[in-house]
Amino acid sequence: MPVFKLLLSLFFILPLGVSAQGWMSSERSADGVANTFRIMSYNVENFFDVYDDSLHLDDDFLPEGSYKWTSQRFVAKAARLARTVLDAGGLGPVDVIGLCEVEGDSAPHHLFHRTRLARLGYRYVVTGGDDVRGMNVAIAWQPMSFSLISHTSFSVPLPAASQRPTRRILLCSGRIASGDTLDVLMLHFPSRRGGKSADPLRQAAVKTVVRVCDSLQHCRRRPHIIVMGDCNATPTDRQLLPLRSAGLRYVPAVIPAGSPVGGTYFFRNGWSCIDQMWTCGEFRGMECQVFVRDYMLERNADGLPVPFRTYRGPSYHGGYSDHLPLVARFFLDF
Protein backbone atom coordinates (compact mmCIF):
# COMPACT_ATOMS: atom_id res chain seq x y z
CA MET A 1 0.00 0.00 0.00
CA PRO A 2 2.76 2.58 0.74
CA VAL A 3 4.27 1.92 -2.70
CA PHE A 4 0.88 2.40 -4.31
CA LYS A 5 0.37 5.71 -2.48
CA LEU A 6 3.81 6.87 -3.59
CA LEU A 7 3.07 6.05 -7.21
CA LEU A 8 -0.31 7.74 -6.99
CA SER A 9 1.25 10.88 -5.53
CA LEU A 10 3.82 10.95 -8.32
CA PHE A 11 1.00 10.66 -10.83
CA PHE A 12 -0.53 13.91 -9.63
CA ILE A 13 2.85 15.66 -9.83
CA LEU A 14 3.86 14.44 -13.28
CA PRO A 15 1.92 15.17 -16.47
CA LEU A 16 -0.08 12.28 -17.86
CA GLY A 17 2.17 11.73 -20.87
CA VAL A 18 5.69 12.58 -21.89
CA SER A 19 6.86 15.42 -24.07
CA ALA A 20 9.45 13.53 -26.12
CA GLN A 21 10.21 9.96 -27.00
CA GLY A 22 13.72 10.09 -28.42
CA TRP A 23 14.16 7.91 -31.44
CA MET A 24 10.56 8.22 -32.61
CA SER A 25 11.64 11.07 -34.87
CA SER A 26 13.08 9.73 -38.11
CA GLU A 27 16.86 9.42 -37.99
CA ARG A 28 18.76 10.53 -41.08
CA SER A 29 22.26 10.14 -42.40
CA ALA A 30 24.55 13.04 -43.33
CA ASP A 31 23.10 13.21 -46.85
CA GLY A 32 19.57 13.57 -45.46
CA VAL A 33 18.42 10.06 -46.35
CA ALA A 34 16.43 8.24 -43.67
CA ASN A 35 18.42 5.33 -42.26
CA THR A 36 15.70 3.98 -40.02
CA PHE A 37 12.33 2.40 -40.73
CA ARG A 38 9.39 2.98 -38.41
CA ILE A 39 6.25 0.92 -38.05
CA MET A 40 3.11 1.49 -35.98
CA SER A 41 0.37 -0.80 -34.65
CA TYR A 42 -2.85 0.72 -33.34
CA ASN A 43 -6.21 -0.70 -32.27
CA VAL A 44 -8.44 2.28 -33.02
CA GLU A 45 -11.57 1.07 -31.15
CA ASN A 46 -14.63 0.57 -33.31
CA PHE A 47 -13.73 2.86 -36.19
CA PHE A 48 -17.02 2.30 -38.02
CA ASP A 49 -18.30 4.39 -40.89
CA VAL A 50 -21.87 5.71 -40.68
CA TYR A 51 -23.33 3.64 -43.53
CA ASP A 52 -25.40 0.50 -43.15
CA ASP A 53 -23.70 -2.68 -44.32
CA SER A 54 -26.42 -5.22 -45.02
CA LEU A 55 -23.89 -8.08 -44.86
CA HIS A 56 -22.68 -7.34 -41.33
CA LEU A 57 -24.10 -6.53 -37.91
CA ASP A 58 -23.13 -2.87 -37.74
CA ASP A 59 -26.56 -1.50 -36.77
CA ASP A 60 -25.36 -0.27 -33.36
CA PHE A 61 -22.88 2.07 -35.06
CA LEU A 62 -25.31 3.97 -37.24
CA PRO A 63 -26.78 7.44 -36.61
CA GLU A 64 -30.03 5.83 -35.47
CA GLY A 65 -28.30 2.91 -33.70
CA SER A 66 -27.81 2.38 -29.98
CA TYR A 67 -24.42 4.17 -30.06
CA LYS A 68 -25.79 7.15 -32.03
CA TRP A 69 -22.74 7.03 -34.33
CA THR A 70 -23.22 10.21 -36.36
CA SER A 71 -21.15 11.76 -39.14
CA GLN A 72 -19.97 14.43 -36.71
CA ARG A 73 -18.66 11.81 -34.29
CA PHE A 74 -17.03 9.84 -37.10
CA VAL A 75 -15.24 12.91 -38.47
CA ALA A 76 -14.12 13.95 -34.98
CA LYS A 77 -12.69 10.49 -34.29
CA ALA A 78 -10.86 10.41 -37.63
CA ALA A 79 -9.28 13.77 -36.82
CA ARG A 80 -8.13 12.49 -33.43
CA LEU A 81 -6.62 9.35 -34.93
CA ALA A 82 -4.85 11.46 -37.55
CA ARG A 83 -3.38 13.62 -34.80
CA THR A 84 -2.00 10.53 -33.06
CA VAL A 85 -0.44 9.16 -36.26
CA LEU A 86 1.12 12.54 -37.09
CA ASP A 87 2.56 12.95 -33.60
CA ALA A 88 3.94 9.41 -33.69
CA GLY A 89 5.79 10.35 -36.85
CA GLY A 90 7.46 13.42 -35.37
CA LEU A 91 9.60 15.06 -38.06
CA GLY A 92 8.65 12.51 -40.72
CA PRO A 93 5.77 10.10 -41.37
CA VAL A 94 5.70 6.58 -39.96
CA ASP A 95 6.59 4.22 -42.81
CA VAL A 96 4.00 1.47 -42.20
CA ILE A 97 0.86 1.64 -40.06
CA GLY A 98 -1.29 -1.31 -39.01
CA LEU A 99 -4.83 -0.68 -37.74
CA CYS A 100 -7.28 -2.91 -35.88
CA GLU A 101 -11.06 -2.40 -35.73
CA VAL A 102 -11.76 -0.50 -38.93
CA GLU A 103 -14.95 -1.07 -40.92
CA GLY A 104 -14.77 -1.66 -44.64
CA ASP A 105 -12.98 0.71 -46.98
CA SER A 106 -14.69 4.01 -46.24
CA ALA A 107 -13.33 4.46 -42.69
CA PRO A 108 -9.62 4.13 -43.61
CA HIS A 109 -10.26 6.07 -46.82
CA HIS A 110 -11.51 9.03 -44.80
CA LEU A 111 -8.63 8.73 -42.34
CA PHE A 112 -5.90 8.75 -44.97
CA HIS A 113 -7.52 11.00 -47.59
CA ARG A 114 -9.82 13.41 -45.72
CA THR A 115 -7.80 14.37 -42.63
CA ARG A 116 -4.42 16.02 -42.04
CA LEU A 117 -2.86 12.73 -43.13
CA ALA A 118 -3.94 13.36 -46.73
CA ARG A 119 -0.86 15.46 -47.52
CA LEU A 120 1.42 12.53 -46.61
CA GLY A 121 0.21 10.33 -49.47
CA TYR A 122 -0.40 7.10 -47.58
CA ARG A 123 -1.79 4.13 -49.46
CA TYR A 124 -3.61 1.32 -47.72
CA VAL A 125 -5.33 -2.04 -48.00
CA VAL A 126 -8.02 -3.47 -45.75
CA THR A 127 -9.20 -7.04 -45.24
CA GLY A 128 -12.57 -8.43 -46.27
CA GLY A 129 -15.32 -9.02 -43.80
CA ASP A 130 -15.28 -12.46 -42.20
CA ASP A 131 -16.05 -10.81 -38.85
CA VAL A 132 -19.81 -10.66 -38.23
CA ARG A 133 -19.67 -6.97 -37.26
CA GLY A 134 -17.54 -6.07 -40.27
CA MET A 135 -14.48 -5.24 -38.18
CA ASN A 136 -11.28 -5.51 -40.20
CA VAL A 137 -7.56 -4.86 -40.03
CA ALA A 138 -5.76 -2.51 -42.41
CA ILE A 139 -2.19 -1.67 -43.37
CA ALA A 140 -1.11 1.72 -44.71
CA TRP A 141 2.32 2.60 -46.05
CA GLN A 142 4.50 5.36 -47.45
CA PRO A 143 5.19 4.45 -51.12
CA MET A 144 8.62 6.12 -51.02
CA SER A 145 9.87 3.90 -48.19
CA PHE A 146 7.76 0.76 -48.69
CA SER A 147 7.19 -0.25 -52.30
CA LEU A 148 4.30 -2.70 -52.22
CA ILE A 149 4.95 -6.00 -53.99
CA SER A 150 1.81 -7.89 -53.00
CA HIS A 151 -0.90 -8.19 -50.39
CA THR A 152 -3.25 -10.97 -49.38
CA SER A 153 -5.42 -11.94 -46.44
CA PHE A 154 -5.97 -15.26 -44.70
CA SER A 155 -9.18 -16.55 -43.15
CA VAL A 156 -8.95 -18.36 -39.82
CA PRO A 157 -10.43 -21.89 -40.07
CA LEU A 158 -13.31 -22.43 -37.66
CA PRO A 159 -12.61 -25.21 -35.12
CA ALA A 160 -16.36 -25.79 -34.77
CA ALA A 161 -19.25 -25.07 -37.11
CA SER A 162 -21.08 -23.26 -34.31
CA GLN A 163 -18.37 -20.61 -33.90
CA ARG A 164 -18.61 -17.22 -35.53
CA PRO A 165 -15.90 -16.29 -38.05
CA THR A 166 -13.16 -14.03 -36.80
CA ARG A 167 -11.09 -11.33 -38.45
CA ARG A 168 -8.75 -12.17 -41.31
CA ILE A 169 -4.98 -11.82 -41.06
CA LEU A 170 -3.49 -9.34 -43.53
CA LEU A 171 -0.09 -9.74 -45.19
CA CYS A 172 1.62 -6.92 -47.08
CA SER A 173 5.02 -7.51 -48.69
CA GLY A 174 7.13 -4.62 -49.92
CA ARG A 175 10.60 -3.53 -50.91
CA ILE A 176 12.36 -1.17 -48.50
CA ALA A 177 15.32 1.16 -49.01
CA SER A 178 17.89 -1.50 -48.10
CA GLY A 179 16.72 -3.53 -51.09
CA ASP A 180 15.28 -6.22 -48.85
CA THR A 181 11.72 -7.52 -48.85
CA LEU A 182 9.77 -6.76 -45.68
CA ASP A 183 6.72 -8.91 -44.89
CA VAL A 184 4.22 -7.32 -42.49
CA LEU A 185 1.37 -9.32 -40.96
CA MET A 186 -1.43 -7.43 -39.21
CA LEU A 187 -3.70 -9.40 -36.90
CA HIS A 188 -6.50 -9.03 -34.40
CA PHE A 189 -6.94 -12.28 -32.52
CA PRO A 190 -10.39 -13.24 -31.13
CA SER A 191 -11.57 -11.54 -27.97
CA ARG A 192 -11.10 -13.02 -24.51
CA ARG A 193 -14.75 -12.32 -23.68
CA GLY A 194 -15.77 -15.83 -24.69
CA GLY A 195 -13.63 -17.37 -21.96
CA LYS A 196 -12.37 -20.90 -22.54
CA SER A 197 -15.01 -21.49 -25.20
CA ALA A 198 -13.13 -19.05 -27.44
CA ASP A 199 -9.74 -20.73 -26.86
CA PRO A 200 -9.96 -23.04 -29.91
CA LEU A 201 -10.63 -20.09 -32.21
CA ARG A 202 -7.69 -18.14 -30.77
CA GLN A 203 -5.49 -21.20 -31.20
CA ALA A 204 -6.63 -21.49 -34.81
CA ALA A 205 -5.72 -17.84 -35.40
CA VAL A 206 -2.24 -18.36 -33.95
CA LYS A 207 -1.75 -21.46 -36.11
CA THR A 208 -2.73 -19.45 -39.19
CA VAL A 209 -0.01 -16.89 -38.43
CA VAL A 210 2.51 -19.70 -37.87
CA ARG A 211 1.58 -21.32 -41.17
CA VAL A 212 2.02 -18.05 -43.07
CA CYS A 213 5.36 -17.32 -41.39
CA ASP A 214 6.60 -20.84 -42.14
CA SER A 215 5.78 -20.33 -45.81
CA LEU A 216 7.54 -16.96 -45.89
CA GLN A 217 10.65 -18.39 -44.25
CA HIS A 218 10.83 -21.10 -46.88
CA CYS A 219 10.42 -18.77 -49.86
CA ARG A 220 12.65 -15.91 -48.65
CA ARG A 221 16.43 -16.25 -48.79
CA ARG A 222 16.74 -13.71 -45.97
CA PRO A 223 13.32 -13.37 -44.33
CA HIS A 224 12.40 -10.12 -42.61
CA ILE A 225 8.97 -10.61 -41.07
CA ILE A 226 7.06 -8.39 -38.65
CA VAL A 227 3.89 -9.72 -37.02
CA MET A 228 1.88 -7.12 -35.13
CA GLY A 229 -1.55 -6.25 -33.82
CA ASP A 230 -3.94 -6.94 -30.97
CA CYS A 231 -3.20 -10.46 -29.70
CA ASN A 232 -5.84 -10.32 -26.94
CA ALA A 233 -3.28 -12.12 -24.78
CA THR A 234 -0.11 -11.17 -22.94
CA PRO A 235 3.25 -12.06 -24.55
CA THR A 236 3.78 -14.94 -22.10
CA ASP A 237 0.33 -16.46 -22.60
CA ARG A 238 0.54 -20.16 -23.40
CA GLN A 239 -1.63 -19.68 -26.49
CA LEU A 240 1.13 -17.58 -28.06
CA LEU A 241 3.84 -20.21 -27.49
CA PRO A 242 3.52 -21.52 -31.08
CA LEU A 243 4.78 -18.13 -32.30
CA ARG A 244 8.04 -18.65 -30.43
CA SER A 245 8.27 -22.24 -31.64
CA ALA A 246 7.97 -20.95 -35.22
CA GLY A 247 11.07 -18.77 -34.77
CA LEU A 248 9.30 -15.50 -34.00
CA ARG A 249 10.79 -13.24 -31.32
CA TYR A 250 8.72 -10.94 -29.16
CA VAL A 251 9.90 -7.31 -29.23
CA PRO A 252 9.35 -5.94 -25.71
CA ALA A 253 7.32 -2.75 -25.62
CA VAL A 254 9.23 -0.13 -23.63
CA ILE A 255 7.30 2.37 -21.54
CA PRO A 256 8.69 5.90 -22.11
CA ALA A 257 10.57 7.34 -19.14
CA GLY A 258 8.31 9.44 -16.95
CA SER A 259 5.10 7.98 -18.35
CA PRO A 260 2.42 6.82 -15.89
CA VAL A 261 1.11 4.05 -18.17
CA GLY A 262 1.96 0.38 -17.81
CA GLY A 263 1.09 -1.07 -21.20
CA THR A 264 -1.22 -0.57 -24.16
CA TYR A 265 -4.53 -1.59 -22.60
CA PHE A 266 -6.15 -1.02 -19.20
CA PHE A 267 -8.60 -3.67 -18.00
CA ARG A 268 -9.95 -4.40 -14.52
CA ASN A 269 -7.64 -1.99 -12.73
CA GLY A 270 -4.47 -3.16 -14.43
CA TRP A 271 -2.33 -2.52 -17.50
CA SER A 272 -1.22 -5.17 -19.97
CA CYS A 273 0.52 -5.34 -23.35
CA ILE A 274 -1.96 -7.27 -25.46
CA ASP A 275 -0.85 -5.21 -28.48
CA GLN A 276 2.45 -6.66 -29.62
CA MET A 277 5.17 -6.88 -32.25
CA TRP A 278 7.01 -10.07 -33.16
CA THR A 279 9.84 -10.47 -35.65
CA CYS A 280 11.54 -13.18 -37.65
CA GLY A 281 14.90 -12.50 -39.26
CA GLU A 282 17.53 -9.87 -38.57
CA PHE A 283 16.40 -6.37 -37.61
CA ARG A 284 19.34 -4.29 -36.46
CA GLY A 285 18.60 -2.00 -33.53
CA MET A 286 14.94 -3.06 -33.36
CA GLU A 287 13.16 -1.19 -30.56
CA CYS A 288 9.50 -0.82 -29.70
CA GLN A 289 7.77 1.75 -27.51
CA VAL A 290 4.27 2.41 -26.28
CA PHE A 291 3.37 5.74 -27.85
CA VAL A 292 1.55 8.05 -25.45
CA ARG A 293 0.71 11.73 -25.19
CA ASP A 294 -1.27 13.65 -22.58
CA TYR A 295 -4.31 14.00 -24.82
CA MET A 296 -4.55 10.21 -25.23
CA LEU A 297 -5.11 9.69 -21.50
CA GLU A 298 -7.59 10.55 -18.80
CA ARG A 299 -8.06 9.63 -15.14
CA ASN A 300 -10.56 7.00 -14.11
CA ALA A 301 -12.71 7.10 -10.97
CA ASP A 302 -9.72 5.95 -8.89
CA GLY A 303 -7.50 8.71 -10.24
CA LEU A 304 -5.41 6.34 -12.34
CA PRO A 305 -4.33 7.11 -15.92
CA VAL A 306 -6.23 5.15 -18.55
CA PRO A 307 -6.68 5.47 -22.33
CA PHE A 308 -9.13 8.20 -23.33
CA ARG A 309 -11.62 6.05 -25.18
CA THR A 310 -14.37 6.87 -27.66
CA TYR A 311 -17.11 5.03 -25.76
CA ARG A 312 -17.63 3.95 -22.18
CA GLY A 313 -20.04 1.10 -22.61
CA PRO A 314 -22.89 2.51 -24.74
CA SER A 315 -22.16 6.12 -23.73
CA TYR A 316 -20.22 8.40 -26.07
CA HIS A 317 -17.09 9.65 -24.36
CA GLY A 318 -15.39 11.47 -27.24
CA GLY A 319 -11.85 10.15 -26.88
CA TYR A 320 -9.29 8.50 -29.12
CA SER A 321 -9.21 4.76 -28.43
CA ASP A 322 -9.29 2.26 -25.57
CA HIS A 323 -5.80 1.13 -26.67
CA LEU A 324 -2.47 2.92 -26.92
CA PRO A 325 -0.42 2.34 -30.08
CA LEU A 326 3.01 0.80 -30.48
CA VAL A 327 5.74 2.39 -32.57
CA ALA A 328 8.89 0.45 -33.47
CA ARG A 329 11.98 1.28 -35.46
CA PHE A 330 14.96 -0.56 -36.91
CA PHE A 331 18.02 0.43 -38.93
CA LEU A 332 17.93 -0.19 -42.66
CA ASP A 333 21.44 -1.63 -42.93
CA PHE A 334 20.67 -5.20 -41.85
Task: Label each residue range with its predicted role.
Residues 102-181, 189:
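Structured beta-strand-rich core segments of catalytic domains in phosphoester-bond hydrolases
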Residues 18-115, 125, 129-135, 207, ...:
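N-terminal, active-site-proximal structural segment of metallo-dependent hydrolase catalytic domains
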Residues 104-106, 132-134, 192-194, 232-238, ...:
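Active-site environment of divalent metal-dependent phosphoester hydrolases
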Residues 38-46, 150-152, 181-191:
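Active-site-proximal beta-strand elements of phosphoester/diester hydrolases
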Residues 45, 102-103, 188-190, 231-234, ...:
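Catalytic metal-binding/acid-base residues of hydrolase active sites
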Residues 20-31, 211-225, 232-334:
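Metal-dependent phosphoester-hydrolase catalytic domains
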Residues 1-23:
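Bacterial Sec-dependent N-terminal signal peptides
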